[in-house]
Amino acid sequence: MLKGILYIIGIYQRYLSPLKGPTCRFYPSCSRYAHESLTRYGLVKGLWLTTIRILKCHPFHPGGVDPVK
């Protein structure tokens, strides 16, 4: 399951993300953050951290540097 999710993120980063350009308000990008958190912490905690990060992605959040902790 984890490998499948990482594969889908890789497909998104390789083929879809370049089409929309650099629009992420965070560094690293949300897809990179998801890949790092899933690789570092596994499926459950990685998905939890990714969900929290995506919930922060809205016009009222300033964004900025938000590394995987």
From Swiss-Prot:
Gene Ontology cellular-component terms for this entry are: plasma membrane
* SMART domains membership: Haemolytic
In the bilayer, the protein is annotated as: Peripheral membrane protein
Q: Name one Pfam family in it.
A: YidD
The chain's coiled-coil residues are: none
Domain of life where this protein originates: Bacteria
**What is this protein's function?**
Could be involved in insertion of integral membrane proteins into the membrane.
| Name of the featured protein | Putative membrane protein insertion efficiency factor
Native source organism of the sequence: Geobacter sulfurreducens (strain ATCC 51573 / DSM 12127 / PCA)
